[in-house]
Design a protein with these regions (language model features):
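Extended boundary segments
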Residues: 24-75, 146-148
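Glycine- and charge-enriched low-complexity intrinsically disordered segments
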Residues: 131-150
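Short alpha-helix capping/helix-loop boundary micro-motifs
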Residues: 88-95
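Short, basic/aromatic beta-hairpin or loop at an interaction surface
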Residues: 71-86
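Short, compositionally biased
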Residues: 112-135
């Protein structure tokens, strides 16, 4: 139990410890893009990405790794549909309008790699691709299909 001074010191000491921990705790760094810069939203028009907030950020629950900011082409959409991932047909039950030529979308890294290997990858906006895409896709391959972000 201790004296009043001991109890006060214990309380103040604990508070100082917590303040110290807050001061030295590293500032949480937001997600980075494949260029090592802060990740920016891929699309404001469509609700894309794992979080459906327009950004290609991810977490450990995103098994598909929706981290590649792509610009749709009719060629890629046809390939994707043929491969079993129909991105062009609207699905109102999921609030999905369907994608068309020129739409941006956070694509699964493995799907982009599959399309790349088939010679059909969509273009990408490097500034908006989350860095973990590099665990699956070579940066040089992304750069070869990069378009300038607005």
């Amino acid at each position: 139990h201790g004296s009043f001074q001991e109890r006060i010191f214990t309380l103040v000491g604990k508070r100082l410890w917590f303040l110290y921990q807050e001061m030295i705790a590293p500032i949480k760094k937001g997600p980075l893009n494949v260029l090592g810069q802060p990740l920016q939203p891929c699309c404001n028009k469509l609700k894309t990405g794992w979080y459906r907030n327009g950004s290609c950020e991810t977490d450990e629950n995103d098994h598909g790794r929706h981290v590649v900011c792509t610009v749709m082409t009719d060629k890629f959409l046809a390939f994707s549909k043929m491969a079993g991932n129909d991105l062009s047909t609207p699905m109102p039950q999921y609030q999905f309008p369907g994608l068309g030529e020129g739409d941006c979308w956070c694509l699964c890294a493995s799907r982009w790699q599959e399309a790349f290997e088939a010679g059909m990858p969509p273009q990408v906006k490097l500034e908006y691709c989350e860095e973990s895409a590099l665990e699956i896709i070579d940066l040089e391959n992304l750069q070869a299909f990069a378009v300038k972000a607005p």
